[in-house]
Amino acid sequence: MELDSLIQRATQYEEKTVAVAAAEDHEVIEAVASAIERNLAKFILFGDKEKILQIMEEHHGDLAKNPKLQIIHTHSPAASAEHAVKAVKLNEANVLMKGNVPTATILKAVLNKEYGLRAGSVLSHVAVFEVPGFDRFTILTDAAMNIAPDLEQKAQITRNAVGIAKSIGVDNPKVAPIAAVEVVNPAMQATLDAAALTAMNKRGQLAGCIVDGPLALDNAVSLTAAEHKGIKSDVAGQADILLVPTIEVGNALYKSLIYFAKAKVGAVIAGAKAPIVLTSRADSAESKLYSLALAICSASK
């Protein structure tokens, strides 16, 4: 599957509005220009208006005149984060996007008790990869938000990822809780949690998906590896969602896919009242565009 299909899917929905916090960033403006060109969304850009216009004039001279674009000046990154979050809270926008603002600053606004977007559940990072040679999306969670989630948090992280998967057409996603081995070992918490999540799925506590674990990474994604080890499972070798036990595992796998496998990626923060595009400054404009498309699909489900 190609991530370009997410852009096509997103354009089929009713047009959404994206609120961008601190939009004075070259890659952000590039992604916004590409999104508008593809009729992906409308945008409200919060930030230093003079800098935003300067970036537009350098690369996209007519962009500022586009009727699908609104620029609202704010005096600081923190203020832009607050205004962008409030725009989503007040239903003036459907998606929140991070621009040139620290992650901690925008998350502080998202979690604000007065005007924030907390929905009572765990916020988690969900990344959708297009891996060369694979015939399906690889969905990875959580590589950026939850450091060492417990069983209850892993269950909610799974639900968040399943919701994202369904929004992009994976109707009954197969979830592999990842561990170092395929058997339950009382000395390895990841295997205990994986077994519990599998049982929860069978009892209907984790609905709308198929969960089976623990599974090592090779057995989760490769039918050949699973067959060699004699693992019989509805998930082994066919996993849509890789649920990692810790942020270190997720972060290393995320970056390995990008830098070693040359995978493409789009990612969102799920679990809030609206999807959040929280890409890093190192991410390309293409990756930001895929993340926008993913967020729009999620907001439209």
Predicted regions and their residues:
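Anion-binding alpha/beta catalytic cores of soluble intermediary-metabolism enzymes, centered on
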Residues: 1-235, 240-244, 249-301
